[in-house]
From Swiss-Prot:
This is Mu-conotoxin-like Cal 12.1.2f. GO terms for molecular function: ion channel regulator activity; toxin activity. It comes from the Eukaryota. Keywords: Bromination, Disulfide bond, Hydroxylation, Ion channel impairing toxin, Neurotoxin, Secreted, Toxin. Its main location: secreted. The keyword Zinc does not apply. Disulfide bonds join 3-15, 10-27, 17-32, 26-38. The cysteine framework is XII (C-C-C-C-CC-C-C). It comes from Californiconus californicus. Signal peptide: none annotated. The modification 4-hydroxyproline is found at residues 22, 39.
Amino acid sequence: DVCESVAGRCIHNGCWCERSAPHGNCCNTSGCTARWWCPGTKWD
């Protein structure tokens, strides 16, 4: 699914995501778009 914005970051399935996170999701208004994904988020 699409990430929900929380305090300027995105969180999904208990995983915080930041654009600067080397192994996290890059989140934007369209949802999660990144080469690397947090565990359990890639197919949501």
